[in-house]
UniProtKB/Swiss-Prot annotation:
InterPro entries: Ribosomal_bL28 (IPR026569), Ribosomal_bL28/bL31-like_sf (IPR034704), Ribosomal_bL28_bact-type (IPR001383), Ribosomal_bL28_sf (IPR037147). It comes from Shewanella loihica (strain ATCC BAA-1088 / PV-4). One of its GO terms (cellular component) is cytosolic large ribosomal subunit. Belongs to the bacterial ribosomal protein bL28 family. One of its GO terms (molecular function) is structural constituent of ribosome. GO terms for biological process: translation. The keyword Glycoprotein does not apply. This is Large ribosomal subunit protein bL28. Residues 1-21 are annotated as: Disordered. Pfam families: Ribosomal_L28 (PF00830). Keywords: Ribonucleoprotein, Ribosomal protein. It comes from the Bacteria.
Length: 78
């Protein structure tokens, strides 16, 4: 499973570690992804999404039904 948030589309990005001597070594910044089950009231079932914590805040704000409708409009299987 890829490290991509299903709601926001956040992906890993690449940058540098910096030591005290300012030496640069490449590293990846990973999104804070969580597997989370959300209850869909109108379908009477749970859906499991891989979302970032920012995505969870968006779901809290908009509502899970609206977010799932947007995912389905994009063609994602939910």
């Amino acid at each position: 499973m890829s490290r991509v948030c299903q709601v926001t589309g956040k992906k890993p990005m690449v940058g540098n570690n910096r030591s005290h001597a300012k030496n640069a070594t490449r590293r990846r910044f990973l999104p804070n992804l969580q597997n989370h089950r959300f209850w869909l009231e109108d379908e009477k079932r749970f859906v499991q999404l891989r979302v970032s914590t920012k995505g969870m805040r968006i779901i809290d704000k908009k509502g899970i039904e609206v977010v799932v409708a947007e995912l389905r409009a994009r063609g994602e299987k939910v």
